[in-house]
Amino acid sequence: MIILPAIDIIDGKPVRLYQGDYNKKEIVADDVFETAKSFQDMGAEYIHLVDLDGAKSGSNQNHELVIKIANELNIPVELGGGIRSFETIKYLLDNGVARVILGTIAMEDEELLKKAIAIYDSKIAVGIDCKDGKVYGRGWLAASDLDYIEFAKKMENIGVKNIIVTDISKDGTLEGPNVEMLKKLKRTVSIDITASGGIKDIENIKELKNIDLYGAITGKAIYAKTLSLEKAIEISKEGR
């Protein structure tokens, strides 16, 4: 399993939301680039960036910053949030971003998703953001009738290699991840699963590692200092 430290971006600043609520925004560091570099210095193998402006409105105002990070660090960077056209996918991947995470567009435009996978294969991941078993889109602002298990199976059938699963009700809470939800998903699909939302401490990292997931994304726990990133990385590498 790999650990992906997360940086959520609003107006070029590193922030955290509580349960995806844009009104519960907290700036967690001074500078996005320096935060990303510090994660690399601590031994991170991959960095997870979320463009919250993009997720909410589809804007690309943070893309220049993301590309700078992708090109100046020595580790791969993935980006999610507001990526809703093939042109944007191409622009980001052609300019150094290692993987893009599609959310809303994966729900709304199957043909675009298939085209992106045909060309970029594993550089395309799909974010499955859910609450009470239902998938959400538009920066977690829009509920759908899609069941998260059925949606994950559909993504696997389309050819998606990697899904990032977030329990919105856990995000930013430090209450621990939704382990049962992740176990159920792991039993159902054979593609790579990255868990996001709720991680608090090293015990949570051990729990997720025991499920044999591809990755675990953690943000707030690092900023709140309830989790040592170096220790989490060390545990994630055991037995690799």
Swiss-Prot record:
InterPro entries documented for this protein: Aldolase_TIM, His_biosynth, HisA_bact_arch, Isoase_HisA-like, Isoase_HisA-like_bact, RibuloseP-bd_barrel
One Gene Ontology biological process: L-histidine biosynthetic process
Catalysed reactions, as listed in the record: 1-(5-phospho-beta-D-ribosyl)-5-[(5-phospho-beta-D-ribosylamino)methylideneamino]imidazole-4-carboxamide = 5-[(5-phospho-1-deoxy-D-ribulos-1-ylimino)methylamino]-1-(5-phospho-beta-D-ribosyl)imidazole-4-carboxamide
Subcellular location: Cytoplasm
Any single Pfam family the record assigns to this protein: His_biosynth
Superkingdom, natural source: Bacteria
MF terms (GO), sorted A to Z: 1-(5-phosphoribosyl)-5-[(5-phosphoribosylamino)methylideneamino]imidazole-4-carboxamide isomerase activity
Active site, per annotation: D8 (proton acceptor), D129 (proton donor)
Keywords (A to Z) from UniProt: Amino-acid biosynthesis, Cytoplasm, Histidine biosynthesis, Isomerase
Pathway(s) annotated for this protein in UniProt: Amino-acid biosynthesis; L-histidine biosynthesis; L-histidine from 5-phospho-alpha-D-ribose 1-diphosphate: step 4/9
EC class of the enzyme, as a word: isomerase
GO CC aspect terms: cytoplasm
EC number: 5.3.1.16
Family membership noted in the UniProt record: Belongs to the HisA/HisF family.
HAMAP family: HisA (MF_01014)
Name of the protein this chain belongs to: 1-(5-phosphoribosyl)-5-[(5-phosphoribosylamino)methylideneamino] imidazole-4-carboxamide isomerase
UniProt organism field: Clostridium beijerinckii (strain ATCC 51743 / NCIMB 8052)
